[in-house]
Amino acid sequence: MAKSPLGLFAGRVLKAKKKRQRWSISRYKRRELGLDRKANPMGGSPQARGIVLEKVGVEAKQPNSAVRKCVRVQLIKNGKSITAFLPRDGAMNFIDEHDEVHVEGMGATQGGAMGDIPGVRFKVFKVNGTSLHELVIGKKEKPRR
């Protein structure tokens, strides 16, 4: 292995060597090449709109036993399909196929799945422009198209 240059005027060479070595650090490489943004279906944005394709039930991981209510959503911006969780009791009753929904991340670490719902990284917070929370608690009615 070649030794690092020493001496008074070795700064430029040392700097260039450090720059080359940084590419072996995986975090640096992912950040510089934008791999996390490319892998993210929402393209790095915090929220996205989509069309509901179907309602699905996702089984919870062990030791819990439940069917978590989710929907398959096709994003408008790039056509990618994602699974989004429906928070709160009875939220599934307010969502039909072909509704327009707004989705956001679930808030888990590193953008991953949260809690006992495997493979679900996003949640629905609006249906046809109305807050899902307000629909569930009965403050607002779902607008008819």
UniProtKB/Swiss-Prot annotation:
Record Pfam families: Ribosom_S12_S23
Gene3D superfamilies referenced in this protein's UniProt entry, alphabetically: Nucleic acid-binding proteins
GO CC annotations, alphabetized: small ribosomal subunit
GO biological processes: translation
Domain of life of the source: Archaea
TM stretches of this protein: none
Quaternary structure and partners: Part of the 30S ribosomal subunit.
NCBIfam families per record: PRK04211.1, uS12_E_A
Family indicated by similarity: Belongs to the universal ribosomal protein uS12 family.
Protein name: Small ribosomal subunit protein uS12
Source organism per UniProt: Cenarchaeum symbiosum (strain A)
